Amino acid sequence: MTATIDTPAGTQKTVRPSPGSKTAKANKRALLGPYVTAGALLTISVLLIGICAQLVLLSPLQHRAAQSSGFDKLRAELAAGTVAVSQTDQQGRLLRPGTPLMLLEIPKLHVREVVFEGTDSDVLAKGPGHRRDTLLPGQAGTSVIMGRAAAYGGPFRHLADLAPGDTFRITTGQGRFTFRVLDQRHAGDRAPTAPAAGKGRVVLMTATGPPYLPKGVLRLDADLTGAAADTPALRIAPDSLPSSELPLRGDSVVWWQVVLWLQALAAASAAAVWAWFRWGRRQTWIVFTGPLGAIGLQVAEQVTRLLPNLL
């Protein structure tokens, strides 16, 4: 804000506020206000659009690519007889999360999915995951397989359509096993009696509720119809997994990546807003659309790992 005063000679003189005065600070805030508001709105808009695009449009494509590569690797290892049949590989080391372990086929649901080792958000983005503190399907005892209900292909989205008596197959390094559904259960329902000695069971798990808005966990129990395979000892004790591998949990380890990408998005948004006001709208669209979109998708991909793993 400036002021004009009359001098004794009758002329006018412009008086500018000093840099540290309240008037100067108010002028600075008034100038920065539109930039800050526009930058914040742009950052939020890019983030929300990126998350929606990641979950609805890109995640099914990523799931399909992971299934294709996982199936090729699993088929080659099945042919060579090198597929892991326990919690460890041939060198005695714990299997890495994301290792393809088995093929799940549910004819009634038209599901044919490679199952990977592990159940955190990153692994379940590839397909169903085997809970690492349980036995493999076909062995004597209970095995747990978890899968998403909506995002990343939603392989278990119709799991509730299975009824008692329905069957499905699982192929592991020990052969092909058939399971017959016992029943479904939700939170608070009584679990069935544990399988008898020498018998096998699989529990399939996914989320309940509207798509992308999980409210609870659906468990489907199914018993092995034939004889159980050799059962190695567990190396990972039951209920000793990190929280990120439990149902409806996110992976908090990626927070630092989210923060870094958010900083990059905020910086890119600030540059885009400055260019919009000082450079030109057309030039800003041409230069910043690509970088903002790419950074927004990177942020969204990390944010989805913070969301419930059965989403």
Question: What do the PLM-derived regions correspond to, one by one?
Answer:
Residues 1-23:
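Acidic/Ser-Thr/Pro-Gly-rich, low-complexity N-terminal segments
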Residues 2-6, 27-260, 304-311:
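Solvent-exposed, non-transmembrane regions of membrane-associated and secreted proteins
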Residues 7-9, 17, 34, 287-298:
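Alpha-helical membrane segments of multi-pass proteins
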